[in-house]
């Protein structure tokens, strides 16, 4: 009887719609065992629930309930099912479901959600936007008996480990993920913060080398991916067609012949983890699919991501025709910034004939087209990468229609009208036609470039982290990174241009004093941008001429000037090839 009493105290009984509605008023987490009247609640997990209740000791935050599907209208989809179902209600919202008595999974889910609630209550984190799931049985979903749409995007997070990044396996893994139809929403090579590494790999906590593993993940470069499921694939299946009444009866001794008709159906894609397992990529990449945990990791690692997704922040390519570029560029740039655009990249360029034809293709049927192309190919245009919410549409709206005549009639306040030219009756501005077109055009006009960068041994760990943050803030992609002791042999692969100089021995003395961080940094004009960030070679001169540069902030003298970078693209390519080769991976 004592055991029976403990079970009643452990799990409240909900056997009517009114009691269900009252239960949803619970604060915190309520774990609901959905059961059938004929078989009763799942006894296999009651010991786990008791253990969680005792160990977590959070009576105000953690509640356990048994709910009879037969008596509750809301639970109708779960009636007459044999497999146990556990629902997780967080402050009245059903956010997760587990099919079957999967005790380890239930345990992880409860602990993670309670930990979230504690941190929220303590003001240590903002409440994530929890996903409310529809109450649909998994079999119904599989066979299409119930259909629903969710406007809430659910993400997985994948971390490709440092060894795989160093061997460039991350490129292969990303290609396979996208070819399967998954969408990589954001990707970045980074050092994992310790709190993220410990929680993300919490399943390994009992491994004897866990602390060593955490150190590796927080001091070596991993590739972090935030991935959405993408659309389910459409496949053609064949459906049997009934024979018509007037067809001859088949010979009973013959094999029956059934006619099939093609039918387009949606095939549910495997989960990301299942796909990774099937492709034998799990040794290189770990996946987290718990929506609550992924939401938390996104808040820590990519704090702007949710805002950018919800407001549809995007990039577009803008172009100023030569006459505007020469005479009105500064005025136009002021207008662009006043309209809320951020100018990410900009350059002056003379278009090739192919580029000019692509930009001016809307005028190709006009008599003046050839003259326009000649004009575009003989003078400087100004190209920009612009960012804001709905950037593609907003920029096209700002610049107006393709001709001055149309603009006067429908968009008199557009840039087309304000900066109309007498040479050609066309809009003196260009914008990408779509988000996809924008990304293609941006990569064409602002192709990524890589340079070799080095943080010298005298820079402290704290300062090193600050430099890495500055690199990230400057929108460099940290393509590769490794910590190296630059012996004379290794140093000559980086400083090959000065090995014959008198001062080279002094350089070797500085480099041999400790560990350096060697990196490949990638972005458009990477060589020039990194040299600008570094500042003048002498830190004292840097403090006068470029006080915010890295050498001004972290340099001590000419030799210990904090950072180093290639002087030009040729030097960068040679140094990268020297340092980041397969023979050096084990350094």
Swiss-Prot record:
<dbReference type="GO" id="GO:0035686">
    <property type="term" value="C:sperm fibrous sheath"/>
</dbReference>
<comment type="subunit">
    <text>Monomer.</text>
</comment>
<dbReference type="InterPro" id="IPR036249">
    <property type="entry name" value="Thioredoxin-like_sf"/>
</dbReference>
<dbReference type="GO" id="GO:0097228">
    <property type="term" value="C:sperm principal piece"/>
</dbReference>
<feature type="domain" description="Thioredoxin">
    <location>
        <begin position="2"/>
        <end position="119"/>
    </location>
</feature>
<protein>
    <recommendedName>
        <fullName>Thioredoxin domain-containing protein 3</fullName>
        <ecNumber>3.1.-.-</ecNumber>
    </recommendedName>
</protein>
<dbReference type="GO" id="GO:0005634">
    <property type="term" value="C:nucleus"/>
</dbReference>
<dbReference type="GO" id="GO:0097598">
    <property type="term" value="C:sperm cytoplasmic droplet"/>
</dbReference>
<dbReference type="GO" id="GO:0097225">
    <property type="term" value="C:sperm midpiece"/>
</dbReference>
<dbReference type="Pfam" id="PF00334">
    <property type="entry name" value="NDK"/>
</dbReference>
<comment type="function">
    <text>Probably required during the final stages of sperm tail maturation in the testis and/or epididymis, where extensive disulfide bonding of fibrous sheath (FS) proteins occurs. In vitro, it has neither nucleoside diphosphate kinase (NDPK) activity nor reducing activity on disulfide bonds. Exhibits a 3'-5' exonuclease activity with a preference for single-stranded DNA, suggesting roles in DNA proofreading and repair.</text>
</comment>
<keyword id="KW-1015">Disulfide bond</keyword>
<dbReference type="InterPro" id="IPR036850">
    <property type="entry name" value="NDK-like_dom_sf"/>
</dbReference>
<keyword id="KW-0221">Differentiation</keyword>
<keyword id="KW-0378">Hydrolase</keyword>
<keyword id="KW-0677">Repeat</keyword>
<dbReference type="InterPro" id="IPR034907">
    <property type="entry name" value="NDK-like_dom"/>
</dbReference>
<dbReference type="GO" id="GO:0030317">
    <property type="term" value="P:flagellated sperm motility"/>
</dbReference>
<feature type="region of interest" description="NDK">
    <location>
        <begin position="454"/>
        <end position="587"/>
    </location>
</feature>
<dbReference type="GO" id="GO:0008408">
    <property type="term" value="F:3'-5' exonuclease activity"/>
</dbReference>
<keyword id="KW-0963">Cytoplasm</keyword>
<dbReference type="InterPro" id="IPR017937">
    <property type="entry name" value="Thioredoxin_CS"/>
</dbReference>
<dbReference type="GO" id="GO:0005737">
    <property type="term" value="C:cytoplasm"/>
</dbReference>
<dbReference type="InterPro" id="IPR013766">
    <property type="entry name" value="Thioredoxin_domain"/>
</dbReference>
<keyword id="KW-0217">Developmental protein</keyword>
<dbReference type="GO" id="GO:0008017">
    <property type="term" value="F:microtubule binding"/>
</dbReference>
<dbReference type="GO" id="GO:0036157">
    <property type="term" value="C:outer dynein arm"/>
</dbReference>
<feature type="region of interest" description="NDK">
    <location>
        <begin position="313"/>
        <end position="453"/>
    </location>
</feature>
<dbReference type="Pfam" id="PF00085">
    <property type="entry name" value="Thioredoxin"/>
</dbReference>
<dbReference type="InterPro" id="IPR051766">
    <property type="entry name" value="TXND_domain-containing"/>
</dbReference>
<feature type="disulfide bond" description="Redox-active">
    <location>
        <begin position="39"/>
        <end position="42"/>
    </location>
</feature>
<comment type="similarity">
    <text>In the C-terminal section; belongs to the NDK family.</text>
</comment>
<dbReference type="GO" id="GO:0060271">
    <property type="term" value="P:cilium assembly"/>
</dbReference>
<dbReference type="GO" id="GO:0005930">
    <property type="term" value="C:axoneme"/>
</dbReference>
<dbReference type="GO" id="GO:0007286">
    <property type="term" value="P:spermatid development"/>
</dbReference>
<keyword id="KW-0744">Spermatogenesis</keyword>
<dbReference type="GO" id="GO:0034614">
    <property type="term" value="P:cellular response to reactive oxygen species"/>
</dbReference>
<feature type="region of interest" description="NDK">
    <location>
        <begin position="157"/>
        <end position="255"/>
    </location>
</feature>
């Amino acid at each position: 009887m004592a055991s029976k009493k403990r079970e009643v105290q452990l799990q409240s009984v909900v056997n009517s719609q009114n009691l269900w509605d009252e239960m949803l008023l619970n604060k915190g987490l309520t774990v609901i065992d959905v059961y059938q009247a004929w078989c009763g609640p799942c006894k296999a997990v009651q010991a786990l629930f008791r253990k969680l209740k005792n160990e977590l000791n959070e009576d105000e935050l953690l509640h356990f309930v048994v709910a009879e599907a037969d008596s509750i209208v809301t639970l109708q989809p779960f009636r007459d099912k044999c497999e146990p179902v556990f629902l997780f209600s967080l402050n009245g919202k059903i956010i997760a479901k587990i099919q079957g008595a999967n005790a380890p999974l239930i345990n992880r889910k409860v602990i993670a959600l309670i930990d979230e609630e504690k941190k929220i209550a303590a003001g240590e984190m903002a409440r994530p936007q929890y996903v409310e799931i529809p109450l649909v049985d998994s079999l119904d979903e599989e066979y299409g008996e119930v259909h629903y749409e969710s406007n809430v995007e659910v993400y997985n997070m994948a971390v490709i480990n440092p060894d795989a990044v160093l061997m460039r396996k991350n490129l292969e893994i990303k290609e396979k993920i996208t070819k399967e139809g998954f969408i990589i929403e954001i990707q970045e090579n980074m050092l994992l913060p310790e709190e993220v590494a410990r929680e993300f790999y919490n399943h390994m906590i009992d491994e004897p080398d866990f602390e060593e593993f955490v150190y590796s993940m927080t001091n070596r470069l991993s590739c972090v991916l935030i991935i959405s499921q993408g659309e389910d694939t459409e496949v053609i299946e064949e459906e049997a067609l009934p024979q018509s009444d007037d067809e001859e009866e088949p010979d009973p001794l013959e094999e029956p012949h059934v006619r099939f008709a093609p039918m387009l159906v949606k095939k549910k894609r495997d989960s990301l983890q299942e796909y990774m397992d099937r492709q034998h990529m799990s040794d290189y990449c770990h996946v987290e699919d718990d929506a609550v945990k992924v939401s938390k990791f996104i808040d820590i690692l990519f704090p702007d991501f949710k805002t950018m997704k919800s407001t549809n922040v995007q990039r577009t390519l803008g172009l100023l025709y030569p006459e505007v570029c020469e005479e009105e560029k500064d005025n136009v740039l002021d207008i662009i910034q006043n309209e809320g655009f951020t100018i990410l990249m900009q350059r002056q360029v003379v278009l090739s004939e192919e580029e000019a034809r692509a930009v001016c293709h809307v005028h190709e049927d006009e008599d003046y087209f050839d003259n326009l192309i000649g004009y575009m190919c003989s003078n400087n245009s100004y190209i920009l990468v612009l960012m804001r919410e709905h950037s593609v549409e907003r920029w096209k709206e700002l610049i107006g229609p393709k001709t001055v005549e149309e603009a006067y009639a429908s968009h008199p306040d557009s840039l087309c009208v304000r900066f109309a030219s007498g040479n050609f009756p066309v809009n003196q501005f260009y914008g990408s036609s779509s988000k996809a077109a924008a990304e293609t055009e941006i990569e064409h006009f602002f192709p990524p470039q890589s340079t070799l960068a080095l943080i010298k041994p005298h820079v402290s760990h704290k300062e090193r982290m600050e430099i890495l943050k500055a690199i990230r803030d400057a929108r460099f992609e940290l393509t590769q990174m490794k910590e190296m002791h630059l012996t004379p042999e290794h140093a000559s692969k980086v400083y090959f241009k000065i090995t014959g100089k008198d001062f080279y021995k002094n350089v070797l003395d500085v480099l041999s004093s400790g560990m350096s961080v060697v990196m490949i940094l990638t972005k458009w004009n990477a060589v020039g941008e990194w040299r600008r960030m570094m500042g003048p070679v002498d830190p004292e001169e840097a403090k006068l001429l470029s006080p915010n540069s890295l050498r001004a902030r972290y340099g001590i003298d000419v030799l210990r000037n904090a950072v180093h970078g290639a002087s030009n693209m040729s030097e960068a390519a040679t140094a990268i090839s020297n340092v980041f080769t397969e023979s050096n991976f084990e350094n």
